[in-house]
Amino acid sequence: MPRIPTAEVPKEVLDYLFDEFDIWAKIHDGRLISEPIDGLPSSTWPNATAMIIKHFLPDGKHIATTHCVKDDSGHVFHWDTKDLRLHDVRLWRA
């Protein structure tokens, strides 16, 4: 499968689009299916795991990727945007 066109955008733009399209709300209320990729120990926070998480629509289409660092109790130390797919274009955080 060919790679989709990708445009680098500043973090502020990607954060704005996540807010504008309610991506965070959709992640938290379960409207998007979230699948973490195997995590690694965090280099910043002891006893925490850093994960890349892919977020999908119910039909299986990948629409966003985030980076999350949390501990075993579920406390989130850091969670930010990585990319957003709009139609057939990927917006990647520069």
For the regions a language model picked out, list residue spans one by one.
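Catalytic toxin/effector domains delivered as secreted proteins or via bacterial secretion systems
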Residues: 1-94
